[in-house]
Amino acid sequence: MPQQNLLILYGSQTGTAEDLAGRLSREAKRHHFNCRTEALDEYRVANLINEHLVIFVCATTGQGDPPDNMKNFWRFIFRRNLPHNALCQMDYAVLGLGDSSYPKFNFIAKKLHKRLNQLGACPLLPAALGDDQHELGPDAVVDPWLKDLWSKVLSMFPLRPGLEIISEDVLLPPKYSLRLLEEKVGQSELSGDAYERDFISNNTTPPSEIHPFLAPVLSNERVSAHDHFQDVRLIEFNITGSAIQFYPGDVVMVQPRNSLLHVEQFCSLLHLDPLNKVVVEPSDPESPVPMHLAALCSVQQLVERYLDICSIPRRSFFQLFCHFSPDEMEREKLKEFSCAAGQEELYSYCNRPRRTILEVLVDFPHTTRCIPATFLLELIPQIRPRAFSIASSMEALPNTIQILMAVVQYKTKLIEPRRGLCSTWLASLPPHGTERVPIWVKKGSMKFPCDPDTPVVMVGPGTGVAPFRAAIQERVANGRPGNCLFFGCRGKSKDFYFEKEWEDLGNRGYLTLFTAFSRDQEDKIYVQHRIKENSKLLWDLIGTKQGYVYIAGNAKLMPNEVTDALKWVLQLEGGMSAPDAEQYLASMEKSCRFQSETWS
């Protein structure tokens, strides 16, 4: 009897859903299932009609949006012309990850579960709705749900006679194993020249994650006051000859690197020679090694460019890490962090102080020394690319991309300040230096009106103003007035980004600007207050002239408060009832006249 096939599909923005899909995959192997795991947008969705057992793991981002790597799938699965029985052969389960402090908690998982059922698929269980706000995190829901899932699945597909579930004490082989060679790399290989020749874009097709463009840094300017608590940079990349095309609302992806100091510390802890050549090999011949892994040639490149040693380790890290421990005390502690009962302890140790993988390795020296190199790719996740809204227009500034970036740094109970991997690295790069930044462009969610006479209202506090600078530059370059910007920050003299630029455009009749400086007076003033103060203008632009409204910035409170202010304007100036104002904004959203791009 052949093994039962199981497909695990995930949509992940920060890596949590992908990590959970990996956990499911390992559990499937322990239950003797033939398991495939793919990101939703990497899976050929037309094949879904042939699948019989599928588990979906998906996060909800921003204001109820799907993760970037499931957006194409999301559009496809909600096509109106799909037959109502298209998935009648499928048994499925949906595992969602969200944050209950947001209004659209686990919106994607709930909607996907309902849609699959509408298309004839049979749910194995109610959708699981993991919550970041729970004191134990998503695992509070995930752990009992997985027990119920495997109980249900095994009742439908029992183990073959003579087979038993593989114990957690048994170490499964890694998906990709790392082999160290005695041969050393040369200086040109260590600097990455050979690696980059294989890895970079060929300049005839647009760069991508597989083939990024290595962009020189043209400028790196601090645009917040030097005595301001937050270091914000305007960074400009040279994209001459890259074949990159972008439009207002698009995002540039940046692949960051670990610092050489952290690379050296990691290699020292594991007794690795950075100069050793490496080969990455698949455990399964049918799972070829990804190109970016196959191109790696040295330990230093592996650690600097691939292993996310400065990320916060997840539970899965400790579940594997404890297998290598020869020390009884360390092993017991690692097992505690690995089990369901130890999650509160793990949260206090890792999540609350934001302790990194590298710092955990320091804390468990006996175990760290015994990590087999072959398991490094299984133990430590890949460095994820970071997304930045493009803050410039190709029309105004050809051959360049600019980003507005806050350098992440904060204190916890740990002595060493916490620093953002990507922002710290980018902020350290000097203009016209030798270091190149791997970048590529992805289409953004914002779409601006084609009609030059359509007014545009933009609400972008802080670094949320970045995509609107690109839009305003482009519209001005094409002679389009009717640009209205609501910008908010802490202080006029502290973090008023692009002040002179906005002033010049206002004087030329291209921009109407409203500012909210929250800390320049006793009572805090935010962009939503300015919206209410200018209700007549807003109603004229939105209600009379059918303008477009855009919101960008932090997803926590601002988007909802701005939306409430807009509803207030519709009621006051448009004479609408509260339900009518709600419906009006909903219809604007449906016709793309009301758009938002927010991030956590």
UniProtKB/Swiss-Prot annotation:
Coiled coil: none annotated. FMN binds at residues 12-17, 59-62, 97-106, 132. NADP(+) binds at T463, S518, R519, K524, I525, Y526, V527, Q528. It is found in: Cytoplasm, Perinuclear region. Interacts with ciapin1; as part of the cytosolic iron-sulfur (Fe-S) protein assembly (CIA) machinery. PANTHER family: NADPH-DEPENDENT DIFLAVIN OXIDOREDUCTASE 1, NITRIC OXIDE SYNTHASE-RELATED. This is NADPH-dependent diflavin oxidoreductase 1.
